[in-house]
């Protein structure tokens, strides 16, 4: 897989924008060819019954927590994200999602283990790019991401959302980190013993997730058995909906 190095001037520009605005866009974080490879893999995984969890919260989406390929990207792209943000990071978890026609992502903030989040486009079948929107610098901004392009943002601080999807499918992976010298270091590996595929029935976390989705959250209310909108792959009642 081709992961291009970021030269010093570009890295400095990205880090400055990230410091100032809370987000930056990294074109071709992986090559378009590598993105297409993973998109094909993700689509083929639909043939494995139970591999993805339906996500009614997004109207038309399926997702997988800690998919092995996504976890690989989480590790392999850590240094790239560190250069682009100017921060030393710890990996938390990844999430692979396939959106279908009519899918929508309500405006929301993420939980602490998504302190430094990335959204990486892998592939799609649609008439046009489907922007990921953020509120930064006092304005709403639509960020188009082609295959291989990555948005890096402060997930718990930068509101983000997507308008209804009009294409057939859109494959996206999300890579989440925390600052190595920050206040959320306990969220390393998202409470797991290691990075890699996670079976919630046989494996345990060393903490229980917080019940808040973030400050000023505007995410619509979800039912207790619906997938948690944070992208964990767990039911809402077992994740952000857990009673304190």
Where are the model-predicted features located?
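Non-heme Fe(II)/2-oxoglutarate
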Residues: 2-85
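A structural connector/turn signal
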Residues: 13, 138-140, 217, 225
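Conserved double-stranded beta-helix
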Residues: 57-58, 63, 73-132
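Catalytic core of non-heme Fe(II) oxygenases with the double-stranded beta-helix
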Residues: 101-157, 169-172, 178-194
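Short, cationic low-complexity segments
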Residues: 139-142, 193-214
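Short, Lys/Arg- and Gly-enriched loop/turn segments at beta-strand edges
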Residues: 159-166
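Acidic/negatively charged segments and metal-coordination signatures
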Residues: 203-244
